[in-house]
Amino acid sequence: MAPTPSILPPALPNQPYVTVSPMAGGFITLSDKFFVHPSSPDAKRTVPSLAFLVTHPGPHNTTPHGASPSNPSRPFNLMFDLGLRRAKERYPEALQRHIEGRAPYQLEPGIAAQLEAGGLDPGEVDLVMLSHCHYDHHGDPELFANAHFVVGHGGLDVLEHGVGGKGSHQHFVPGTLPLERSSELPDPSGAGRGEEGKWKPLGPFPATLDYFSDGSVFVVDTPGHLPGHLNLLCRLAEHRWVMLCGDTYHDRRLLTGEREIGTWEGADGGTLCIHLDPEKAKESIRRLREFEGLVGQGEVELVAAHEEEWWERNRGKGFPGKL
């Protein structure tokens, strides 16, 4: 039994559970001053860009976005984020310069090579869902030739047209995703949220989506960092979940309230922030904090994409292992 009453949906009869296997899709070095306040001017952390293989055992009553295993007898393989590209030269010059500013960094071997080394052909990844479209999350999409790509509402427009935001991290490359195999989730603020298969509230989150329609995986709308930013809430066992938080926060101290979101002065004297909409980002972090207080103790583990201490504790569970 759960230690305390929880807001999470109870397990169904014959409830399917997913497995989640973390991977480090490269490493970059981040200066605290760009992410948290207050901060030491020289404080830096070399952090992973985490990606996660989420494996659904099947069968699939509802197969999202028409994506299905090439062999229906095998599980459904979903990648949440793909980390960094495997080589700096696979980025345009503007992003190569940005990565050089994140030294020391490590890009090799890339997620596709790690999957192969662990016994999974990247061609058997059925779906790639991106928390958002930044360079350190979209990885090498062309190495996943059979996957369907899913982004949050507005994500495809970000890739094709950018966001008009300043800062070297706000650089996007049209054509990064194969448009013929890419889809956006519906607008979480639109009408029809309460309809079957549409966005529904869960605890403090106004918009969540039961992705496989079986209570195993919930997409959580977490706006602020970039249009279409998503978290993924995965049911591992009856009373055990993990929420994959992408870039909702970059530092655990933002969750505890020990730090605030950082800003810095750009070359033109304007104020810059790692989040495109800092106020919405603050609200998403507040909701995460509230969510932690509403679920059963130890029932849900939260992990963001750049948590180096979490990775050091859990790298032994990395693919082909599982959490």
Question: Where do the PLM segments sit?
Answer:
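Zn-dependent metallo-beta-lactamase
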Residues: M1-R102, A207, R287
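Metallo-beta-lactamase
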Residues: L8, A103-L120, E124, G152-D221, ...
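Active-site metal-binding loops of divalent metal-dependent hydrolases
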Residues: G25-F27, L82-L84, C133, G224-L226, ...
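Structural motif
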Residues: F76-L78, L127, W241-V242, E301
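Active-site metal-binding motif and surrounding structural segment of the metallo-beta-lactamase
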Residues: A94-V151
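Cap/insert and terminal regions of metallo-dependent hydrolase folds
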Residues: I99-A113, E238-L323
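Active-site environment of divalent metal-dependent phosphoester hydrolases
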Residues: C133-G139, L226-L230, H250-L254, E307-E312
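Glycine/small-residue-rich hydrophobic helix-like segments
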Residues: F205-T208, F212-G262
